[in-house]
Amino acid sequence: MNKPYTKPDYEQELRRAGVRITRPRRIILNILNETEDHPDALEIFRRAVEEDDSISLSTVYHTMKLLEERGAIHRHAFAGGPSRFEQASGAHHDHIIDMDSGDVVEFHSDKIEKLQEEIARSLGFEIVHHRLELYCKKLKS
């Protein structure tokens, strides 16, 4: 049921849009491209300073804002925590948020997508955009 998707590399696209790709921006883009999780700005900062200790938290915030404005990343404001980020991709997916650990799991289900379309259509609507976030607790063994 889970379908893999690839995260695009936005560096070239940002250059075409006139955005200068500085070392901190490249490091942050690489972090987002290589990560499997949805880090917050502080976690991105921690990972960035491992590569270049001259990067400041302010630089991370400014870069994240720029990347969000350019459509290179998505900001998620999951309940109960700081904004989390992921590199934008063309493939739609939904999220399960583990309420105990805060972990975010991406998934795609054709069955859920079809049901949402059927419901919208039956009520006289066409889905333009949607976001599904399931807040869950792990099953006990």
Curated annotation (Swiss-Prot):
Keyword Zinc in record: yes
Binding site for Fe cation: 92, 94, 113, 130
GO terms for cellular component: cytosol
Region (Dimerization): 90-141
Subcellular location: Cytoplasm
Gene3D superfamilies reported for this sequence: 3.30.1490.190, Winged helix-like DNA-binding domain superfamily/Winged helix DNA-binding domain (1.10.10.10)
UniProt record similarity statement: Belongs to the Fur family.
Protein name: Ferric uptake regulation protein
Gene source species: Brucella melitensis biotype 1 (strain ATCC 23456 / CCUG 17765 / NCTC 10094 / 16M)
